[in-house]
Amino acid sequence: MDSRLHRLINLEVTPGKDVRKTAIIGTIGPKTNNVDTLVALRKAGLNIVRMNFSHGSYEYHQSVIDNARKSEQVYPGRPLAIALDTKGPEIRTGTNVDDVDYPIPPNHEMIFTTDDKYAKACDDKIMYVDYKNITKVIQPGKVIYVDDGVLSFEVLEVVDDKTLKVKSLNAGKISSHKGVNLPGTDVDLPALSEKDKEDLRFGVKNGVHMIFASFIRTAQDVLTIREVLGEEGKDIKVIVKIENQQGVNNFDEILEVAHGVMVARGDLGIEIPAPQVLAVQKKLIAKCNLAGKPVICATQMLESMTFNPRPTRAEVSDVGNAILDGADCVMLSGETAKGNYPINAVTTMAETAIIAERAIAYMPLYDDLRNCTPKPTSTTETVAASAVAAVQEQGAKLILVLSTSGNTARLVSKYRPQCPIVLVTRNPRTARFSHLFRGVFPFVYEKEPLDDWSEDTHARLRFGVDMAKEYGFVKNGDAVISIQGFKGGVGHSNTMRVSIVGGEKEDI
């Protein structure tokens, strides 16, 4: 019997030797941008390195890439993926006079302007905003948030095509270059700024594995990014960040053209009421799960660990519940970029993920996914779903996938097997981006192909079992489900086998 209630009643709460299936993404900043710390982060559980292009020079980001790759030479382990997070079409205030902070009392009336002459001359009477069309899209009565909602202003009057008269709704300080949010207002900013385009080209040149695309509002935004990446960057995965109401409204069309999704709850919690973020998170994750596309939950997950060695209980619950919702990956931002306890943060996230994964009722979840998936499915998906069912029926401890593109591993992951999924591929890029898929453990097979395709297949399967033994996934006597193609190339995975490790029936 495997119901959710039965699973929770019998939940093992003490630490064990479980295999963590949820990937961990860590933002690399000044505190962690060195080889020794990156090695320590990887040993603690880091799978994907994130570079935040809202900050830092190209020289700095190049050093992150170089150090990440050096860490793999020092500590080979599992392959490490590198993600480039774009700045995106943000709205920001200008520079304050003498770059000082100005106190703003409640009910304080002032001017917001798009006049460039105030771009470096802001104070508590007039504030520059770099979105030229703000006076065209906003109306009196609307609210403007500044500095992640620290300050709120009500629009009193659209004075002219460059000027808004506003009133503060709370007290606070206004600083230079702070973010501006317009909740409930459709903005018409371009999907990519010139800086974003240059950043993407930098990513292509340096062989990053995925783009975290900020403030995506429409499917066309994703297509625009793909155009900039071009032929040379065609294998880079585009993970869209949903962080405004437009992105939520257009989510279905966005999901169709994206490789994956990040639920970026920071700006989203400003754009829509915070209690609604809970529902949006669950809804978007469920849609990604059904589509078989990876989904990341991000922002303020272990925020207090930026300064404290231990998290709050609420933060641990947040991480765990994101995993129970169905997130493939969870992400750390300031905790690893500038925090005092980056290793602790990754360790805490890894330990929390293991406990949360124990609470999942795998067979009811599998049944939900099978029943809700439109039929007919592709041959590869049919085999992937059957392999997950076979795990339960055979008591198998591992699913072993041979894949060139990683698509088969993605589809196996969709159906959430209780056991690990070992992916064996000759393509290093496939191995690295496959960290995005829940439960997938990628390994690169570096030997040249044998002339005999059958012998080559056997060698790769044998390598996968050896890696699984080395990592403690299986031992002699365990059943293994393997998926492979009937011939070489991409898109031919249609064969499932059951083997016993070290037994008479083992033929791999």
UniProtKB/Swiss-Prot annotation:
Q: Which cofactor does it need?
A: Mg(2+); K(+)
User: Any idea which positions bind Mg(2+)?
Assistant: E243, D267
Superkingdom, natural source: Eukaryota
What is the main EC category here? Answer: transferase
Q: Which GO terms describe its molecular function?
A: ATP binding; kinase activity; magnesium ion binding; melatonin binding; potassium ion binding; pyruvate kinase activity
- Pathway given in the UniProt record: Carbohydrate degradation; glycolysis; pyruvate from D-glyceraldehyde 3-phosphate: step 5/5
Q: What is this protein called?
A: Pyruvate kinase 2
